[in-house]
């Protein structure tokens, strides 16, 4: 046994580094907390082995140990896999410290190898596979070429250790060295080291050597609302209140739309010229475009409908960024070779607001530039004035103000536009509350365009024309309605002049007039040349009824008198005025004068018979004159000129007589057709059958009905002349019909009536006369 003891003394002493991966020694998972111990084989033969369990009394021979050592060197993986115990799941490695250096850093241990290469040794404990009854421990040294474990820590990542693998050492280690950082909107931030060296070896592992000065690089792939910590960029919405008299220069345009309420929702939008200001309606929401930084980014920052303050900002610098708070509007104006005028107003719910940001904006280029200065007022109003700076350019273009009102709900502030006749093209806007608004004055500038009102007028020849009126110094009281209506009153005067534009004198304001009504004084209009006055009260005494027809404000219809003249004014695109006479001859619509209570003179007929004097038969003065249609291929002959004119209207397709019944609006060529159509609305049946109680609306229907009675009854041929009186004919005390009732007398020829029928008619009170020779006589009240 002494020889064996001496042979065991020759075993080389090694430094054993036991790495307890499972946590037996309390070390870290990466190899921290290694225990160093120097062991030596003794003759006692009693040693502790984690794989074998207890000591053995008999020792193997040196030849057996040599054979076991050689087998371990040749197939280390096989022996390691077959004989590894349950307590060595993490493995125990021994590194040779003869050629390595160990240094301790702030976050762990670091083993630095020399340039000549390291030869780490590994000692694995297992039982002897050849000797099943023995659990002895064998310790041998083996050399693993090209590879070591390095425990390193990055200097800039807190408590994050980087485990890098060198060539030849377990290339299947998975680890994560860069933590994931996300912003509030869910986008990941990428870290890139300045001057970092990234190396990749043959086994697929990437070694990152980080440097100093880590920077955060935001992801620029998507254009979300990312607020990056970049220089020259504001981090929050800042109201611009410190630009008292600062002058901003540049050429970038910033245009916005601000709702301004003027009897509706009216927005003053910028126009392309200094000499024009257009008022157009828009929605309540305002769009604000703000310039970005050098990154050319824009960000709308206004929201909400309640406005607490109004700010006026003008900027032309492309490298500046402006923001407003969430309760204010930001309006920007630019003057780049043109004049742009913006009006802003401030308003709140029910009360008037006060301007908060007195500012002045300059940066003027060109002769048409503007200088807008916004001052703070004390009465809860915001005034902005613009003045012309630089050289006064010669402006020949007139200014025209167009107002298109819309309805506004809520306590929005109203905008009163006062254009005073001042020099220098100065406008003053004042935003006042709706509760304190009593009257609105709209005054035109001296060199501004006219306020035009187009009214339909009637010429001396009966033509309807549109007359343009130019109003100056107009004052409207209580502008509460959406439209301005010219309402005719009792003493209204209709003016007709030859000139297209007429300048009116200043109109005095009425004390109390309805909302939205402009009163036109007849005394002022009477001073104009060519005026004709129609007294509506005198029309009723003369027997003329006034009706309201759609399309024109006035229609004059004569009551059934001598000839039943009816005059209708129809505004059908400047068409002539058409009249229809029931029994008169020679009336022409071209010479009708709208005079009160006076008939128009008759005009000679222009038909071919009248021109050639062939209408009246030669030598027979008692025969009536006839009128023939001049249309080629027609040749119809009429006894009255009114009938001929109605026939000519049928040729031309003209229908001047329109039904004024509600929701009807049908038009007819002749007046009797209109009267017959009106009976369909009223249900009146004025034609009664003499033999039965049936009644009819039309006389031709009655004639057809009487023929049915004649066919049923046979007898001697007897012709009767029966005069019927309508039910609605109001007979006077003397038996004469009043002028208000239209008396229609129908001569009905009755043939082959039996004597019983004649006796029945006589008993009913109808005058029955027996005539021997019957002549066709038409004395119908409608004249046709």
UniProtKB/Swiss-Prot annotation:
Gene Ontology BP annotations: definitive hemopoiesis; embryonic camera-type eye morphogenesis; embryonic placenta development; embryonic process involved in female pregnancy; embryonic skeletal system development; enucleate erythrocyte differentiation; gene expression; in utero embryonic development
InterPro entries named among the record's database cross-references: Znf_C2H2_sf, Znf_C2H2_type
Covalent cross-link Glycyl lysine isopeptide (Lys-Gly) (interchain with G-Cter in SUMO2) as placed by the record, residue numbers: 16
Motif (9aaTAD): 464-472
Site (Cleavage) location in chain: 65-66
Post-translational modification N6-acetyllysine, affected residues: 704
Region (Transactivation domain C (highly charged)): 498-611
Cellular component terms (Gene Ontology): chromatin; cytoplasm; nucleus; protein-containing complex
Biased composition (Low complexity): 37-49, 74-87, 126-138, 344-357, 373-398
Comp. bias intervals (Gly residues): 23-34
Gene Ontology MF, one: sequence-specific DNA binding
PANTHER family the record matches: KRUEPPEL-LIKE TRANSCRIPTION FACTOR (PTHR23235), TRANSCRIPTION FACTOR SP1 (PTHR23235:SF16)
UniProt region (Transactivation domain A (Gln-rich)), positions on chain: 148-253
Compartments reported by the entry: Nucleus; Cytoplasm
Region VZV IE62-binding: start-end pairs: 620-784
Main localization (coarse): nucleus
Domain of life the protein comes from: Eukaryota
Residue numbers of Phosphothreonine PTMs: 280, 455, 641, 652, 669, 682, 738
Record-given protein name: Transcription factor Sp1
């Amino acid at each position: 046994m002494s020889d064996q003891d001496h042979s065991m003394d020759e075993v080389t002493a090694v430094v054993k580094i036991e790495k307890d991966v499972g946590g037996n020694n309390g070390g870290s998972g990466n190899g921290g907390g290694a225990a160093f111990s120097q062991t030596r084989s003794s003759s006692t033969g009693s040693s502790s082995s984690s794989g074998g369990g207890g000591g053995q009394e008999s020792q193997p021979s040196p030849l057996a140990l040599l054979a076991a050592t050689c087998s371990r060197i040749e197939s280390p993986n096989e022996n390691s896999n077959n004989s590894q115990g349950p307590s060595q799941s993490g493995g125990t490695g021994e590194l040779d410290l003869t050629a390595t250096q160990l240094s301790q850093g702030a976050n762990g241990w670091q083993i630095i190898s020399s340039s000549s290469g390291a030869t780490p040794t590994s000692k694995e404990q297992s039982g002897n596979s050849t000797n099943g009854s023995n659990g002895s421990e064998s310790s041998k040294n083996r050399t693993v070429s090209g590879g070591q474990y390095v425990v390193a820590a990055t200097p800039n990542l807190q408590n994050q250790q980087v485990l890098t693998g060198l060539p030849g050492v377990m290339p299947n280690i998975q680890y994560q060295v860069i933590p994931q950082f996300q912003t509030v909107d869910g986008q990941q931030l990428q870290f890139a080291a300045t001057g970092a060296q990234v190396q990749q070896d043959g086994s697929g592992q990437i070694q990152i050597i980080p440097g100093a000065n880590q920077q955060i690089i935001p992801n620029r792939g998507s254009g979300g609302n990312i607020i990056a910590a970049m220089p020259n960029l504001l981090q929050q919405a800042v109201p611009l209140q410190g630009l008292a008299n600062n002058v901003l220069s540049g050429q970038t345009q910033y245009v916005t739309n601000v709702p301004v309420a003027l009897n509706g929702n009216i927005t003053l939008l910028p126009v392309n010229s200094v000499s024009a200001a257009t008022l157009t309606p828009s929605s309540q929401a305002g769009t604000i475009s703000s310039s970005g930084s050098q990154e050319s980014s824009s960000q709308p920052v206004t929201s909400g409908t309640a406005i607490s303050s109004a700010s006026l900002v003008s900027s032309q610098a492309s490298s500046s960024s402006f923001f407003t708070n969430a309760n204010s509007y930001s309006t920007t104006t630019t003057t780049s070779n043109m004049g742009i005028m913006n009006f802003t107003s401030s308003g709140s719910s029910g009360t008037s607001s006060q301007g908060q940001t007195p500012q002045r904006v300059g940066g003027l280029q060109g002769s048409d530039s503007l200088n807008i200065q916004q001052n703070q007022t004390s009465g809860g109003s915001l005034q902005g004035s613009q003045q012309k700076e630089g050289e006064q350019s010669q402006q020949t273009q007139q200014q025209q103000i167009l107002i298109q009102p819309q309805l506004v709900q809520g306590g929005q502030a109203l905008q009163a536009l006062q254009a005073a006749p001042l020099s220098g093209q100065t406008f003053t806007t004042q935003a006042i509350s709706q509760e304190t608004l009593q009257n609105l004055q709209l005054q035109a500038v001296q060199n501004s365009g006219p306020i035009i009102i187009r009214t339909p007028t009637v010429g001396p020849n009966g033509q309807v024309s549109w007359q343009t009126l130019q109003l100056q110094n107009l004052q409207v009281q209580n502008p509460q309605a959406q439209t301005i209506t010219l309402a005719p009153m009792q003493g209204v005067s209709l003016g007709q002049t030859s000139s297209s534009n007429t300048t009116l004198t200043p109109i005095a304001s009425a004390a109390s007039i309805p909302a939205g009504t402009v009163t036109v004084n007849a005394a002022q209009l009477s001073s104009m040349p060519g005026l004709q006055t129609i007294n509506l009260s005198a029309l009723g005494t003369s027997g003329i009824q006034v009706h309201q027809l759609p399309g024109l404000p006035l229609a004059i219809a004569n009551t059934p008198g001598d000839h039943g003249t009816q005059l209708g004014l129809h505004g059908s695109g400047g068409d002539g005025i058409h009249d229809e006479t029931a029994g008169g001859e020679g009336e022409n619509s071209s010479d009708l004068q709208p005079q009160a209570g006076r008939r128009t003179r008759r005009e000679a007929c222009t038909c071919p018979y009248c021109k050639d004097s062939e209408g009246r038969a030669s030598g027979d003065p008692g025969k009536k004159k006839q009128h023939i249609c001049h249309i080629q291929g027609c040749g119809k002959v009429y006894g009255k000129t009114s009938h001929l004119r109605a026939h000519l209207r049928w040729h031309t397709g003209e229908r001047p007589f329109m039904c004024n019944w509600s929701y009807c609006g049908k038009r007819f060529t002749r007046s009797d057709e209109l009267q017959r159509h009106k009976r369909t609305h009223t249900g009146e049946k004025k034609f009664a059958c003499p033999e039965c109680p049936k009644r009819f609306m039309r006389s031709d229907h009655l004639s057809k009905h009487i023929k049915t009675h004649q066919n049923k009854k046979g007898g001697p041929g007897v012709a009767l002349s029966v005069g019927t009186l309508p039910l609605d004919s109001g007979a006077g005390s003397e038996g004469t019909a009043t002028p208000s009732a239209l008396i229609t007398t129908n001569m009905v020829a009755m043939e082959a009536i039996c004597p019983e029928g004649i006796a029945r008619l006589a008993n009913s009170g109808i005058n029955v006369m027996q005539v021997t020779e019957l002549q066709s006589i038409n004395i119908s009240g409608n004249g046709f």
